[in-house]
């Protein structure tokens, strides 16, 4: 298998994950900013790899598999770090909800693909808006430069949590008839 540039970008995103985790734990005043910058860079490759794969017609099965895995692992780890840092229920609850939703919907998509109905649970615009709010909130909550950005990040986290429920409901609703069949 020959790897193309979009797939290399996805692999690079996976490689960046331990670096933003390490930056998160560094005992320096600048560490949160470095952590957030690495996360922003990784999140940008999420958009850019898909854009290039479509533009250059270089979509591959491996890339189609790895891209969502890299995204979900990156976001789940960032949510765990944020929940650990704040150590309060009102951050942990939306973080846990978002992680649970990713597991549920990934399982649902896998099951729907097995029965030949993967398109019923294709990514929706709500999922894309949720991801944007989620990424924005995580950048601010990893960085924490001042109270205003932190507050805006909390708001974005809750917007992402609401969209998490909404999109999960939509996906489950789309698959409900198939889920209830014997």
From Swiss-Prot:
Location(s), subcellular: Cell inner membrane
Domain of life: Bacteria
Cytoplasmic-facing ranges: 1-12, 82-86, 169-181
TM region positions: 13-37, 61-81, 87-107, 146-168
Cellular component, GO annotation: plasma membrane
EC top class, as a word: transferase
MF terms (GO), sorted A to Z: CDP-diacylglycerol-glycerol-3-phosphate 3-phosphatidyltransferase activity
Major subcellular site: membrane
GO biological process: phosphatidylglycerol biosynthetic process
Topology in membrane: Multi-pass membrane protein
Reactions catalysed according to its record: a CDP-1,2-diacyl-sn-glycerol + sn-glycerol 3-phosphate = a 1,2-diacyl-sn-glycero-3-phospho-(1'-sn-glycero-3'-phosphate) + CMP + H(+)
Stored InterPro entries: CDP-alcohol_PTase-I, CDP-OH_P_trans, CDP-OH_PTrfase_TM_dom, CDP_ALCOHOL_P_TRANSF_CS, PGP_synthase_bac, Phosphatidylglycerol_P_synth
Signal peptide boundaries: none
EC number annotated for this UniProt entry: 2.7.8.5
Periplasmic side: 38-60, 108-145
Keywords per UniProt: Cell inner membrane, Cell membrane, Lipid biosynthesis, Lipid metabolism, Membrane, Phospholipid biosynthesis, Phospholipid metabolism, Transferase, Transmembrane, Transmembrane helix
UniProt pathway: Phospholipid metabolism; phosphatidylglycerol biosynthesis; phosphatidylglycerol from CDP-diacylglycerol: step 1/2
PANTHER family listed in its UniProt record: CDP-DIACYLGLYCEROL--GLYCEROL-3-PHOSPHATE 3-PHOSPHATIDYLTRANSFERASE 1, CHLOROPLASTIC (PTHR14269:SF62), CDP-DIACYLGLYCEROL--GLYCEROL-3-PHOSPHATE 3-PHOSPHATIDYLTRANSFERASE-RELATED (PTHR14269)
Function: Catalyzes the conversion of cytidine diphosphate diacylglycerol (CDP-DG) and glycerol 3-phosphate into phosphatidylglycerol. Essential for the synthesis of anionic phospholipids, thereby playing a role in balancing the ratio of zwitterionic and anionic phospholipids, which is thought to be important for normal membrane function.
Assigned protein family: Belongs to the CDP-alcohol phosphatidyltransferase class-I family.
Protein name according to UniProt: CDP-diacylglycerol--glycerol-3-phosphate 3-phosphatidyltransferase
Organism from which the protein derives: Yersinia enterocolitica serotype O:8 / biotype 1B (strain NCTC 13174 / 8081)
Classification of source organism: Bacteria, Pseudomonadati, Pseudomonadota, Gammaproteobacteria, Enterobacterales
């Amino acid at each position: 298998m020959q790897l193309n540039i979009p797939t290399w970008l996805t692999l690079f995103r996976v490689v960046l994950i331990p670096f933003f985790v390490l930056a998160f734990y560094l005992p320096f005043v600048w560490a949160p900013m470095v952590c957030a910058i690495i996360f922003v860079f990784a999140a940008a490759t999420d958009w850019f790899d898909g854009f290039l794969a479509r533009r250059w017609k270089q979509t591959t099965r491996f890339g189609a598999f790895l891209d969502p895995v890299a995204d979900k692992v990156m976001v789940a780890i960032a949510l765990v770090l944020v929940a650990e840092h704040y150590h309060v229920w009102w951050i942990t609850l939306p973080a846990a909800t978002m992680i649970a939703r990713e597991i549920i919907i990934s399982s649902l998509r896998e099951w729907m693909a097995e029965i030949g109905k993967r398109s019923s649970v294709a990514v929706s615009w709500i999922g894309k808006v949720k991801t944007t709010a989620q990424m924005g909130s995580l950048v601010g909550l990893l960085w924490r430069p001042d109270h205003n950005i932190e507050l805006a990040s909390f708001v974005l986290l809750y917007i992402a949590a609401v969209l998490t429920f909404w999109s999960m409901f939509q996906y489950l609703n789309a698959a409900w008839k198939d889920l209830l069949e014997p």
